[in-house]
From Swiss-Prot:
This is Large ribosomal subunit protein uL3. GO terms for biological process: translation. InterPro entries: Ribosomal_uL3 (IPR000597), Ribosomal_uL3_bac/org-type (IPR019927), Ribosomal_uL3_CS (IPR019926), Transl_B-barrel_sf (IPR009000). GO terms for molecular function: rRNA binding; structural constituent of ribosome. GO terms for cellular component: cytosolic large ribosomal subunit. One of the primary rRNA binding proteins, it binds directly near the 3'-end of the 23S rRNA, where it nucleates assembly of the 50S subunit. It comes from Polaromonas sp. (strain JS666 / ATCC BAA-500).
Amino acid sequence: MSLSNSLGLLGRKVGMMRLFTDDGDTVPVTVVDVSNNRVTQVKTEANDGYDALQVAFGARKASRVTKPAAGHLAKAGVEAGEILKEFRVTADVAGKYAAGTVVPAADVFAVGQLVDVQGTSIGKGYAGTIKRHNMSSQRASHGNSRSHNVPGSIGMAQDPGRVFPGKRMTGHLGDVTVTTQNLNIVRIDEARQLLMIRGAVPGSKGGFVTVRAAIKAKPTTAAKGAN
């Protein structure tokens, strides 16, 4: 499923735990709360030039909502959310929902499905090139003095006489948007609207994430045989 026609869900990273299979194997999973994903606007080709669903998640105080946003949400009949995101979908998918509809997890995902999870990575603060870019340390001795954990030369001579843009150097590590691809949904708790996704997802506990169908998922053997 391509990125342009897949509905996703917004959620909050609850934390990690493990599940046990019937064979006794342990599976590490990340629990993502995707409850109360509500549609705030349905965009159509006729009115907006493309088909999309605008979805809100979380809760925000009324005093923290701007007047234009408050009017937009009041028109849809939904409460303000902490985050608002738009998903490009097909006309068929857009026609299934109306403004104010709560999208359940089972409507979008299924157990065994591969998904991409996007979030903000944990900030690590100012870091050197070894930690930030996985560079190697220099020699501990044999002529090396006070240059053990530095990157070394960052340029050339008088020509070009400058450091090229994009040179990997020290700086802020983390706190950037990261997408982890092709993660498997192990279980869906429909009662509590929780997704249990195998492996780790970006961000810290309590961080917001976006879950959508994997765009680089390889077809299964059964699907190949069907073709």
